[in-house]
Curated annotation (Swiss-Prot):
Pathway in which this enzyme or protein is active: Cell wall biogenesis; peptidoglycan biosynthesis
GO molecular function annotations of the record: ATP binding; UDP-N-acetylmuramate-L-alanine ligase activity
Top EC group: ligase
Catalytic function, reaction form: UDP-N-acetyl-alpha-D-muramate + L-alanine + ATP = UDP-N-acetyl-alpha-D-muramoyl-L-alanine + ADP + phosphate + H(+)
The protein's name in its UniProt record: UDP-N-acetylmuramate--L-alanine ligase
């Protein structure tokens, strides 16, 4: 048994990894800011100690796992180096862990967390699968056959991994504080493709993914019969989305997903492709797909009277469009109200027009002040720059939250990667309901 200390344990990946090591029988603790972060719930439920930052947290027998958000001068990292302890980055440590399993990396600008959550749930319907999901959820199952994990492209972190398979959901320009342009993003994914050992499953309609070259087979999925695996006869029902799957032009089986939206069918196709390639039992896979309950902060719903309140992590224009599409397909007779908190000044600046276009697909838009990050907490623009580009949009905060009560037959989408849950919970308090998020 090893004693691990995680510097920045409330980070979504760090929280998941800490839970995995705890489940595998190791002693685990960590430190972070004292402000509430939703990822800490799972840590506390497993009895994992969360401490405030302090150099005295570092003890002689520890292996220190360092989060990517903190500089090498951080007091705990500095103490660990002074004591000549093993200090391993999150990426390098995860790379070591996955080598013990048949591993499946899920990467892409959008859809990573939802697809990883679905993959882990469905594969566990047939084979033991440990998993690390970017919503702060992780589980280490002793004697697992597989390891499903989310692999982020930011700062090329995913180049630390050499997975057996990689699901590539899409390539898009994001993280403008690091990537120069879409070509820079493509180069990162191209380099990652050469790390994959058995096969790549990629979305067939992505023009950039179609240009990827690899040393292993690439299987494309989508809605066209030119794809290697594709869905047809898609039907929206009161139970979810039903569809037929074809592999290499031959009918494979009929599936039902309890979710809505084209992107959820695409996620399911990627997972079904992995299951097919690994020859998992299709009956077990179908049953597991039908029971998938979603992941944290991805279209999580709470219903109060005729109003559906949704918590979602969407923080990029394409993700915002996807959540609005899901709301319209699932609740076609309700208004869609978007409450959005932009995440980072650089992203807001880079996608200002795209944010305005995607948010305008809602019936009404409310915007919160821009949420900064540890690396970037100021910028040249303000939230008013985005408000001015969306007809009828207005600013909202905890003091004005009761304005949402007027939309009594609506889906209210709270979206963002910052602390928008404070606003959600303030609204739930106004309605006399215990916090659901």
């Amino acid at each position: 048994m090893t004693h691990y200390h995680f510097v920045g344990i409330k980070g979504s990946g760090m929280s998941s990894l800490a839970q995995i090591m705890h489940d595998l029988g190791h002693e685990v603790q960590g430190s972070d800011i004292e402000n509430y972060v939703f990822t800490e719930v799972a840590l506390r439920n497993k009895g994992i100690k969360i401490l405030p930052f302090d150099a005295n947290n570092i003890k002689e027998d520890m292996v220190v796992i360092q989060g990517n958000a903190f500089a090498s001068s951080h007091e705990e990292k500095a103490r660990a180096h002074q004591m000549k302890l093993d200090v391993v980055s999150y990426n390098d440590f995860l790379g070591q862990i996955i080598d013990q399993y048949t591993s499946v990396a899920v990467t892409g600008a959008h859809g990573k967390t939802s697809t990883t959550g679905l993959l882990s749930h469905v594969m566990n319907g047939d084979k033991k699968t440990s998993f690390l999901i970017g919503d702060g959820t992780g589980m280490g199952l002793p004697e697992s056959d597989y390891f499903a994990f989310e692999a982020c492209e930011y700062r090329r972190h995913f180049l630390s991994y050499k997975p057996d398979y990689a699901i590539m959901t899409n390539i898009d320009f994001d993280h403008p504080d690091y990537f120069k342009d879409i070509n820079d993003v493509f180069d990162a994914f191209q380099e990652m493709a050469h790390n994959v050992k058995k096969g790549i499953i990629a979305w067939g309609d992505d023009e950039h993914l179609r240009k990827i070259e690899a040393d292993v087979p690439i299987y494309y999925y989508g809605f066209k019969d030119s794809d290697d695996i594709y869905a047809q006869n898609i039907q929206i029902t009161d139970k979810g989305t039903a569809f037929d799957v074809y592999v290499d032009g031959e009918f494979y089986d009929h599936f039902l997903s309890p979710q809505y939206g084209d992107h959820t069918v695409l996620n399911a196709l990627a997972v079904i492709a992995i299951s097919y390639l690994e020859k998992l039992d299709v009956t077990n896979i179908k049953e597991a797909l039908e029971t998938f309950g979603g992941v944290k902060r991805r279209f999580n719903e709470t219903t109060i009277a005729n109003q559906v309140i949704v918590d979602d992590y969407a923080h990029h224009p394409r993700e915002i469009s996807a959540t609005i599409e899901t709301a319209r397909k699932k609740y076609p007779h309700k208004e869609v109200v978007a409450v959005f908190q932009p995440h980072t000044f650089s992203r807001t600046q880079a996608f200002l027009n795209e944010f305005a276009e995607s948010l305008s697909k809602a019936d009404r838009v409310f915007l919160c002040e821009i949420f900064g990050s540890i690396r970037e907490n100021t910028g040249a623009l303000t939230i008013q720059d985005l408000i001015d580009k969306i007809e009828g949009a207005s600013l909202i905060n905890e003091d004005s939250i009761n304005v949402l009560e007027q939309f009594d037959n609506a889906v209210v989408l709270f979206k963002g990667a910052g602390d928008i849950q404070k606003l959600q919970n303030a609204y739930l308090d106004k309605l006399g309901m215990k916090n659901a998020f």
